[in-house]
């Protein structure tokens, strides 16, 4: 007996209003992004000269039918105030608002909590983007696929290695129709190397009923607790109502919604062959920086520094930064506001943040130099390259520091002629001796 899929009436193809939601998380999330997230929320960390969330917003602004964007998370409202004010000037055709959750509600729970605001004006489609994703965001192509297939949901997918696939949500799809047949979040065994990229397009009249159904399933589930003896049998079934209701409110798209959509909805996947990676750990900002800079170079962005004998493109230099003409930069380097790079310095595959100093004849490779940090003369700060295709986020493996990007937190000082290799250095540390493969507390 074949499964009968209910079909909605075909839309007229013109495409109605669309809204976008960017999920930004909160202070208790993104802890793997430390020490950088100790001073700046991860969504506002600069990658390729702009906050991570700016890249999402730029892609959204290129979808003509989107005029409203919501940032949903549980940071303090003041955190995004300046960003929203600046973005209103840069993206005048898009209204941007921050909606603060009273607690962490999950990727679907936050959407459902603010459903009235999102559904105001009766949008036809809703984009949902995770802010910690680095990709080209083919939103117009996803919208076109949704209209062609009369889809109720479209997920962005990409291919990764078989070994890496089980770290993500895995998609089984029909290669001809692109229909999603099965979805499993982080399966224990290999199912597919087509994975969830964390970018979704939902029909507005399907998304919230699907979340409501997931909440109902969670609420109706028998509330049983383990017990140690017959003496506490009666009390073992008594679960604190506040604790239980709090758990019921945490609803996640990946674990609670997408699997059911694959079973009974018109659910399709748009597979991208362009770049994609997550920005989970602090070190993952370096390959993301390279990918965004390469994209800017391909699009002929005027933000990039013009190539020269000492500028190997792509390189971003903030207008307020000071770079000596004899310093050599690139490829894939971002220099932040008021940073200084002195004579004879070499910077490659790195991010130099606001007010940092790179003194003369020093060398910075595969590293992030934190805000107001200083790299002394003739010093060498070096990390290990992370392949763009690698999705490993481990910092320590078997008790040993994994060789990876070197990160200096805020206001760190590396002395003259000091070598720092494969280290993570927490803020306000002064390094007076050579160090390698350490987390410096």
Regions found by a protein language model. Give the residues of each.
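Short, hinge-like loop/turn segments at secondary-structure boundaries
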Residues: 86-89, 117, 145, 170-176
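Eukaryotic N-terminal low-complexity, Ser/Thr- and Lys/Arg-rich leader segments
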Residues: 1-18, 90, 120, 127, ...
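Long, charged amphipathic helices and adjacent flexible linkers at domain junctions
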Residues: 293-321
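C-terminal accessory/binding modules appended to enzymatic or scaffolding proteins
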Residues: 316-317, 322-346
């Amino acid at each position: 007996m074949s499964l009968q899929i209910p079909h909605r009436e075909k839309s007229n193809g013109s495409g109605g209003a669309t809204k976008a939601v960017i999920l930004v998380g909160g202070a208790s999330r993104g802890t793997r992004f430390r020490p950088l997230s100790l001073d700046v929320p991860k969504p506002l960390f600069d990658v390729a000269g702009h906050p991570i969330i700016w890249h999402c917003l730029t892609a959204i602004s290129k979808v003509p039918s989107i005029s409203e964007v919501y940032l949903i998370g549980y940071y303090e409202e003041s955190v995004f105030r300046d960003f929203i004010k600046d973005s209103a000037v840069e993206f005048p055709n898009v209204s941007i608002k921050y909606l603060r959750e009273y607690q962490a509600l999950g990727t679907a729970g936050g959407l459902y909590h603010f459903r009235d605001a999102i559904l105001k004006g009766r949008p036809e489609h809703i984009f949902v983007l995770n802010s910690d994703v680095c990709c080209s965001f083919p939103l117009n192509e996803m919208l076109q696929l949704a209209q062609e297939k009369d889809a109720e949901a479209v997920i962005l997918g990409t291919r990764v290695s078989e070994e890496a696939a089980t770290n993500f949500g895995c998609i089984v799809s029909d290669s001809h129709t692109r229909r999603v047949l099965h979805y499993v979040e982080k399966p224990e065994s290999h199912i597919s190397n087509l994975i969830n990229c964390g970018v979704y397009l939902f029909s507005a009249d399907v998304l919230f009923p699907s979340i409501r159904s997931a909440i109902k399933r969670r609420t109706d589930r028998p509330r049983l607790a383990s017990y140690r003896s017959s003496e506490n049998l009666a009390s073992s079934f008594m679960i604190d109502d506040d604790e239980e209701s709090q758990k019921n409110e945490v609803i996640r798209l990946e674990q609670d919604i997408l699997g059911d959509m694959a079973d009974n909805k018109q659910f399709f996947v748009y597979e991208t062959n362009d770049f994609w990676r997550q920005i989970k750990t602090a070190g993952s900002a370096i390959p993301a920086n390279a990918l965004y800079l390469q994209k800017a170079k391909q699009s002929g962005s005027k933000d990039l520094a013009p190539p020269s004998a000492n500028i190997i493109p792509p390189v971003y230099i903030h207008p307020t930064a000071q770079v000596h003409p004899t310093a050599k930069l690139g490829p894939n380097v971002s220099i932040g506001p008021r940073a200084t790079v002195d004579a004879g310095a070499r910077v490659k595959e790195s991010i130099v943040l606001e007010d940092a100093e790179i003194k003369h004849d020093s060398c910075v490779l595969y590293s992030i130099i934190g805000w107001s940090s200083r790299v002394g003369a003739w010093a060498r700060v070096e990390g290990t390259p992370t392949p763009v295709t690698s999705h490993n986020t481990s910092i320590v493996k078997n008790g040993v520091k994994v060789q990876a990007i070197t990160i200096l937190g805020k206001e760190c000082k590396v002395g003259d002629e000091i070598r720092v290799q494969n280290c993570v250095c927490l803020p306000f540390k002064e390094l007076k001796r050579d160090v390698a493969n350490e987390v410096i507390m």
